[in-house]
């Protein structure tokens, strides 16, 4: 299998919100496959500049006239559910002209036609797992096409039109649109309550994963993390329905019941900001060593998913492990922003309580390994609905850190809810010193003033908290000369 000619309806495409993580990736692939692409975004960005350099015509601001950027106008207009309201002037103009408006997942599904399609979904870990699989396959000599929700540090991009017959992509479950896809293999990392503003109940949210598993053809494979209760339950249901399931995790075959275990994580240990793990693959007599440059048990599990999947499609395991050893991570996934003396500043996209807990456990492990310093988190809640629903859980997770700074809520697409601010989380944090910083202009200075040699600082959230990392590094440099030597008095 391989991609055929670009579908006629995708020859001239206008994309509303073209600079977003998901939309920019689609634009890159369209351009690489010969499409004419125009688009609009609210502001200039690195993504917009990169697309312009590749030939896209991009308007800053939203205006119906943007549909005239391409000679003859677009054959379709592409948008997303989450970020673009139906009242957007470009969508209104497209409807007036009778130009079809397609959602991003529909276009991605069209672009994946003809490939062996490997998709990664789950509440957490999608981007990291997808990226690990891509890097592993590239190291094995594959040239997969891919579309991922973050920028791979190795490739410097979030999408690529490859020469091979494999397409690797992230399947976002947040609005149920993943049901547009018809993959050959699905990885499910975990399933727990999220996006209840769309689904209304945990049951409805979980059901979309069952429906997605049903899209696998008779030769399809479902790769599932058995350490996660929600994903393990899905694996059992799918296995009972005759879907070919391959489990991975800490469980051995006896613990997994009837679900076949393809890969077992037997042991893992921190190694600075990386890890070394022992894994046992089905059918092999001895465990293998897996080395990673990214920290945390959750990352070891994500890497194991990539190993199991790559082996499933015929990749050599030794080459897969070599590729994973060189995996440099993904932008905004435990990304090193900078270091000043012995203080390191990282940035992470974590915006759900489980993600926050998992990342902070990894941070605490790194700090404990170095023997001095503290874990310092700067957290920005994302969405009023999520903050209201999970304030207690966020507080519990943040309490893992030694020092906590909480910013106000980044509302994104939502209007404020009465009484829902960052203070709702702050008042429930116990066991760690906590500071509420609703004024973003004061964050960098206050964090730097509270930081000491050996501390590991991490900014965390899905909003503009990511901009604070560089500001904190600058503020730390301004006061570094006043610090005592690392570990002094600690």
Swiss-Prot record:
PANTHER family membership: UDP-N-ACETYLMURAMATE--L-ALANINE LIGASE, UDP-N-ACETYLMURAMATE--L-ALANINE LIGASE-RELATED
Keywords assigned: ATP-binding, Cell cycle, Cell division, Cell shape, Cell wall biogenesis/degradation, Cytoplasm, Ligase, Nucleotide-binding, Peptidoglycan synthesis
Enzymatic reactions: UDP-N-acetyl-alpha-D-muramate + L-alanine + ATP = UDP-N-acetyl-alpha-D-muramoyl-L-alanine + ADP + phosphate + H(+)
Organism: Mycobacteroides abscessus (strain ATCC 19977 / DSM 44196 / CCUG 20993 / CIP 104536 / JCM 13569 / NCTC 13031 / TMC 1543 / L948)
One GO term of the biological process aspect: regulation of cell shape
Pathway: Cell wall biogenesis; peptidoglycan biosynthesis
The protein's Enzyme Commission number: 6.3.2.8
Main localization of the protein described in the UniProt heading: cytoplasm
Gene that encodes it: murC
Keyword Membrane in annotation: no
Function: Cell wall formation.
Entry-linked Pfam families: Mur_ligase (PF01225), Mur_ligase_C (PF02875), Mur_ligase_M (PF08245)
Family to which this protein belongs: Belongs to the MurCDEF family.
Protein's name in the database: UDP-N-acetylmuramate--L-alanine ligase
Stored Gene3D superfamilies: Mur ligase, C-terminal domain (3.90.190.20), Mur-like, catalytic domain (3.40.1190.10), NAD(P)-binding Rossmann-like Domain (3.40.50.720)
Gene Ontology annotations for the cellular component aspect, listed alphabetically: cytoplasm
Alphabetized InterPro entries for the sequence: Mur-like_cat_sf (IPR036565), Mur_ligase_C (IPR004101), Mur_ligase_C_dom_sf (IPR036615), Mur_ligase_cen (IPR013221), Mur_ligase_N (IPR000713), MurCDEF_pg_biosynth (IPR050061), UDP-N-AcMur_Ala_ligase_MurC (IPR005758)
């Amino acid at each position: 299998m391989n991609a055929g000619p670009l579908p006629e309806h995708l020859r001239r495409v206008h994309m509303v919100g073209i600079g977003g993580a998901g939309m920019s990736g689609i634009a890159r692939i369209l351009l690489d496959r010969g499409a004419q692409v125009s688009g609009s975004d609210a502001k200039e960005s690195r993504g917009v500049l990169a697309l312009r350099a590749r030939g896209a015509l991009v308007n800053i601001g939203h205006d119906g006239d943007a549909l005239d950027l391409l000679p003859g106008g677009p054959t379709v207009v592409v948008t997303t559910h989450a970020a673009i309201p139906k009242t957007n002037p470009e969508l209104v103009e497209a409807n007036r002209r009778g130009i079809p408006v397609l959602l991003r997942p529909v276009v991605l599904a069209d672009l994946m036609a003809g490939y062996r399609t490997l998709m990664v979904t789950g509440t957490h870990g999608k981007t990291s797992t997808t990226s690990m699989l891509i890097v592993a396959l590239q190291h094995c000599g594959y040239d997969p096409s891919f579309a991922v929700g973050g920028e791979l540090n190795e490739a410097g991009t979030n999408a690529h039109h490859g020469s091979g017959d494999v397409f690797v992509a992230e399947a976002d479950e947040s609005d149920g649109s993943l049901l547009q896809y018809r993959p050959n293999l699905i990885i499910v990392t975990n399933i727990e309550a999220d996006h209840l503003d769309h689904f209304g109940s945990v049951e409805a949210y979980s059901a979309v994963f069952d429906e997605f598993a049903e899209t696998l053809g008779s030769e399809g494979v479902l790769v599932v993390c058995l350490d996660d209760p929600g994903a393990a339950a899905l694996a059992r249901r799918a296995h009972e329905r005759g879907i070919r399931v391959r489990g991975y995790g800490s469980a051995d075959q006896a613990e997994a019941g009837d679900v076949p275990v393809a890969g077992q994580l037997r042991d893992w240990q921190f190694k600075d900001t990386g890890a070394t793990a022992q894994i046992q693959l089905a059918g092999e007599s001895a465990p293998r060593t897996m080395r990673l440059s990214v920290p945390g048990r959750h990352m070891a599990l994500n890497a194991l998913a990539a190993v199991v999947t790559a082996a499933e499609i015929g990749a050599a395991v030794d080459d897969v492990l070599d590729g994973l050893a060189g995996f440099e991570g993904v932008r905004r996934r435990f990304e090193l922003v900078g270091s000043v003396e012995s203080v390191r500043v990282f940035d992470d996209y974590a915006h759900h309580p489980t993600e926050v807990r998992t990342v902070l456990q990894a941070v605490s492990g790194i700090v404990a390994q170095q023997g001095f310093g503290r874990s310092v988190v700067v957290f920005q809640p994302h969405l009023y609905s999520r903050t209201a629903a999970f304030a207690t859980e966020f507080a519990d997770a943040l309490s893992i850190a030694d020092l906590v700074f909480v910013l106000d809520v980044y509302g994104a697409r939502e209007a404020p809810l009465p009484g829902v601010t960052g203070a709702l989380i702050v008042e429930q944090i116990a066991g760690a010193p906590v500071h509420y910083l609703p004024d973003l202009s004061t964050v960098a200075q206050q964090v730097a003033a509270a930081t000491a040699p050996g501390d590991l600082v991490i900014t965390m959230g899905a909003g503009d908290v990511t901009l604070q990392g560089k500001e904190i590094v600058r503020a730390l440099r301004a006061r570094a000369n006043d610090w005592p030597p690392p570990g002094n008095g600690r």
